[in-house]
């Protein structure tokens, strides 16, 4: 009988632990529901705010790609799908350059990314002739910017 008495409290302890985990889970489940209700209630208020709030602008390079295309080939157009691909390509290249330049700054224990880190990152990321042309155009752009 004594062993059975000991087992019962042991069985109750996990049950109590389960209840506490259930109690912990219940508020977690209720929070998303409350979160879902807030936008619905705020939906009518947000509808009033939407008039005040302008639509978020998405920054793209589409106009710049188009300008460069017209400089190089004035008689050629570009489809929206191709423009999207070019925009993604430029975003990817800039992301790689930013990662490489931040890595270089970290290696040299510098808190600031300067034009030197960007130039070195361009040389590391872009291949051969493309890197040389990019560096010369970048140097020209920085010189023009600082002189004006």
Swiss-Prot record:
SUPFAM superfamilies: Histone-fold. The modification N6-acetyllysine is found at residues 7, 36-37. Its main location: nucleus. It comes from the Eukaryota. Coiled coil: none annotated. Core component of nucleosome. Nucleosomes wrap and compact DNA into chromatin, limiting DNA accessibility to the cellular machineries which require DNA as a template. Histones thereby play a central role in transcription regulation, DNA repair, DNA replication and chromosomal stability. DNA accessibility is regulated via a complex set of post-translational modifications of histones, also called histone code, and nucleosome remodeling. The nucleosome is a histone octamer containing two molecules each of H2A, H2B, H3 and H4 assembled in one H3-H4 heterotetramer and two H2A-H2B heterodimers. The octamer wraps approximately 147 bp of DNA. This is Probable histone H2B.1. It comes from Medicago truncatula. The lineage of its organism: Eukaryota, Viridiplantae, Streptophyta, Embryophyta, Tracheophyta.
